Amino acid sequence: MKPDAHQVKQFLLNLQDTICQQLTAVDGAEFVEDSWQREAGGGGRSRVLRNDGVFEQAGVNFSHVHGEAMPASATAHRPELAGRSFEAMGVSLVVHPHNPYVPTSHANVRFFIAEKPGAEPVWWFGGGFDLTPFYGFEEDAIHWHRTARDLCLPFGEDVYPRYKKWCDDYFYLKHRNEQRGIGGLFFDDLNTPDFDHCFAFMQAVGKGYTDAYLPIVERRKAMAYGERERNFQLYRRGRYVEFNLVWDRGTLFGLQTGGRTESILMSMPPLVRWEYDYQPKDGSPEAALSEFIKVRDWV
């Protein structure tokens, strides 16, 4: 089937609505919407929830941009895209909870299509979701990865292991020699065997995110915590900022295409701290995190 960008866009708009409704049901607060237009072509809907409830900040962004030439961040690993016009659309979200026992989560699903006269379109899907705990709970990690594995199974037994490894490899801070979190799924450049198959997989990932995340939120949101746990959460959020500004391809793509800076940087935590040469106390729950986030098979 020929790629249908309109069909993908409608799914993404509905997905944004659904995820916002589900997060509001947990938190009680409403998202504030900010619709924007991109001067060079396209626009989007940025939605942000900020309050003193379960989520300190949650951002769920839809964007649909188009232009006459692909940016350097995209053509660097796909030189055949040079000289083509493009459309890029997606839903990207990050949830930063108040409670340090509730992990931060990130999800993204996206579609690219690049065209030029007299040539077949070049298109692909990408996306995934990943979890960044501050305090590790094995049952949460197992649930997260089991949900990821189960949504992948209808598409092939090799899909989950392949995209889990890609996630582990991608969300890695080289300058710290550590993972950003416990991973999940990451895929990109997906265009085989055909459009319908790839679109169905992208939909499964988009819908699977809340199945993976919300049960963990419900399990941890009422746990008691104090200043020590909060300070550690803010310190570890620094890793999130470092990854997004130094390594993340999506951030680079958005900035290089003249995307809306407020929406691109919506993933940043509202509060964060750095501490020079911080060393957690031996045997403490904080010290245990470095082992917990090391790559392993959770299911």
Swiss-Prot record:
The record marks H175 as: Important for dimerization. This is Oxygen-dependent coproporphyrinogen-III oxidase. Homodimer. One of its GO terms (biological process) is protoporphyrinogen IX biosynthetic process. NCBIfam families: PRK05330.1. Its cofactor is a divalent metal cation. It comes from the Bacteria. Substrate binds at S92, N108, V109, R110, G258, G259, R260. Residues 240-275 are annotated as: Important for dimerization. Involved in the heme biosynthesis. Catalyzes the aerobic oxidative decarboxylation of propionate groups of rings A and B of coproporphyrinogen-III to yield the vinyl groups in protoporphyrinogen-IX. The gene is hemF.
